[in-house]
Amino acid sequence: RNRCKEEILSFRCHPLRARSLIESLLSKRAAIQLMPSIERPGLDEYFMEIAIVVAKRSTCLRNQMGALFVKNKRILTTGYNGAPAGLEHCDVVGCAREGVPSGTRHELCPAVHAEQNAIIQAAMHGISIEGATLYCTHQPCILCAKMMINARVAKVVYLHCYPDQTALDFLEQAGIEVVRVEE
């Protein structure tokens, strides 16, 4: 109390104004102490939430996927799945993989995967993703896993499973840490 009072009085304000300021500060401090503590998300949760927002840009009719590369707590690039630049999007022409089981026949799909788009953005802008962490809404497929390995990504954090155990095996064999976060 005395320290606050001394600080306010050092501004040489009118004594009545000083008293009002002191009372205001003390009541705000008491109010803050009574507030419930704020639960701050961990970094994996924080960056995964951003990947979820990135996925909302997707035009895929089957799955909206988002990805981002992070290094030293800084976002390097983002990507979402969709048709290559200049081509019609799936939400306009329809899904080429309609009726095809999930995790199979990737070659039929014209879309670029979220992870691939994030890598392309890094390459286009001269950003190294070596040693970075990939946050993606879905587990990477085998094609994207091979790209992560060659790009020397350090860690992959994903939310939703994808029916491609080989991709996970490849990542682990390459020494890339793989973490699935809970919803």
Task: Please annotate each region the language model reported.
Residues 12, 20-183:
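Zinc-dependent deaminase catalytic domain
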